Amino acid sequence: MLVLGVVSVNILNGKAEIFTQPEMVLVKAGSFQMGDESGELWEGTRPVHQVILNYNFWIGKYEVTFAEYDIFCEESGKPPANDQGWGREERPVVNVTWRDAIAYCNWLSEKENFQPAYNEAGELLDFNGNVTTDITRVDGYRLPTEAEWEYAASGGHEAVPIPPRFLFSGSDDIDEVAWYFENSGDEMIFTGTPLTVDYSSHGAAKIQGKSTQPVGQKKPNELGIYDMSGNVWEWCHDWYGEYTVGEKVNPIGADFGHLRVMRGGSWIFGANDCRVGNRLYRPPHEKIFRLGFRFARTEME
């Protein structure tokens, strides 16, 4: 059985509370070429540019599961996320908005007595609770920046070979590391009309045969991180913006926008969509059956 963390006991308001600390992987500071010039990927992955991350950070070893998210929902009074009829437990949570994801991160921070990373407006907070754009000063759990996500998916400080990096997170053979359209189940059957499918509310009654899979079943990447290609797309912190030329240091995305970045591809997408250099976006209020998240945290000195 998959174990996602270690159990500790916290004393809150005089009451003993059992809490499962999440399993995370340390990613050490470094630089990499962000983006992908391949003609097989869309223009939004270009131009390739140098990114420097001059700090260490932690990132979730696994995508957040229903088992973990359900505890948050029970304690916070939020309605549970829809599992599409596929089952819960160790499957990655889906049908969560960007704001649901950052609320989970703040809840997790409070569990471990860290300064929450977000205010109600979704702005980053430093370790004193002040709004900041300096990711190195954010104490609590948060969504990974898009740069952190791609660096970690590419193998981070353990990346081999350098260059070139693997096409997918941990391998050039997608079947080794990812659940995607070709291996996520039997032939897909639409029971609704495909041309009128509303993917924002797409349910198990309208699609059968393929689905998400329990986390951690495929080969991990060089850092020991699972499912960064395929299974579910993952929310990132960043507002979506077009890439520009020139070196970037500790980027956190566009200054403002109306679309948040998502990364990694999913069980219902093709191989190219699961490439580490690929990127897409969705409005932060959307709940989608192919989109979940994992969390990150800056290593404090």
Set out the residue ranges of the language-model regions.
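Boundary at the C-terminal end of the N-terminal hydrophobic targeting segment
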Residues: G14-A16
